[in-house]
């Protein structure tokens, strides 16, 4: 990728919120977010802490860290990871609220936390809000989270980059299986060769 007028991400500021997959825990602390910044000559803010949850419990939760981001700094796209930690820890899913009032969302549930993040980011930065999923792995809990995310997206008019339900994307051959360090975390090669081009195309589409 080069910095040309045909690259809609060039010169933009992208904010990424997440946990170990956004951080790049199996890739030396570099993930697709970093590679998108380099390849597209855009600035990124990567707020990612391994092991953290959407559900608002403690100072490292997604919401706690979201509130520490600079509200006055312009963002062109806000991207949030649908955390696998909430599924692994079996956090309560909750229900989609009838309200659009952030103060009424139950952020001790996955749904309430996702709604809060979507509402907050949209209100603060007035930019496209994106949630992305992991590719498919064995988890009934995460499958339910993805289904609920699509319903939340319809309510809030946000974008879902859904690797979970992309059968072609998830179908790795024997050699490509080395792109995953485990069932959840990509390797550096996995980010570079597999995730980054996919995410780039989805993010490009938001600005064209």
Where in the sequence are the language-model features?
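Catalytic His-Asp segment of secreted/periplasmic serine-dependent ester chemistry enzymes
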Residues: 134-208
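Conserved SGNH/GDSL esterase-like catalytic core that processes O-acyl groups on lipids
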Residues: 10-15, 21-104
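Catalytic phosphate/metal-binding cores of nucleic-acid and nucleotide-processing enzymes, i.e., regions
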Residues: 2-10
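Active-site segments of SGNH/GDSL-like serine hydrolases
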Residues: 81-85, 115-149
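Helix C-cap/helix->beta junction micro-motif
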Residues: 40, 124-125, 156
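A short acidic, glycine-rich active-site loop
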Residues: 99-110, 184-186
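Short hydrophobic segments within beta-strands
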Residues: 17-18, 132
């Amino acid at each position: 990728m080069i910095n040309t007028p045909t690259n809609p991400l060039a010169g933009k500021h992208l904010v990424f919120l997440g946990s170990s997959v956004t951080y790049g825990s199996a890739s030396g602390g570099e993930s697709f977010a970093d590679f998108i910044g380099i390849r597209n000559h855009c600035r990124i803010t990567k707020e990612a802490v391994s092991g953290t949850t959407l559900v608002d419990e403690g100072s490292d939760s997604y919401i706690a860290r979201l509130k520490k981001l600079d509200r006055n700094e312009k963002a062109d796209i806000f991207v949030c990871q649908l955390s696998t930690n909430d599924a692994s820890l079996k956090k309560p899913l909750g229900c989609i609220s009838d309200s659009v009032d952030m103060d009424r969302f139950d952020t001790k549930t996955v749904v309430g936390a996702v709604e809060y993040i979507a509402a907050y980011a949209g209100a603060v930065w007035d930019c496209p809000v994106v949630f992305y999923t992991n590719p498919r792995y064995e988890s009934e809990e995460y499958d339910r989270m993805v289904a609920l995310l699509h319903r939340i997206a319809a309510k809030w008019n946000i974008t879902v980059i859904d690797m979970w339900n992309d059968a072609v994307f998830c179908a790795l051959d024997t050699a490509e299986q080395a792109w995953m360090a485990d069932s959840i975390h990509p390797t550096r090669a996995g980010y570079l060769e597999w995730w980054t081009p996919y995410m780039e195309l989805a993010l490009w589409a938001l600005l064209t």
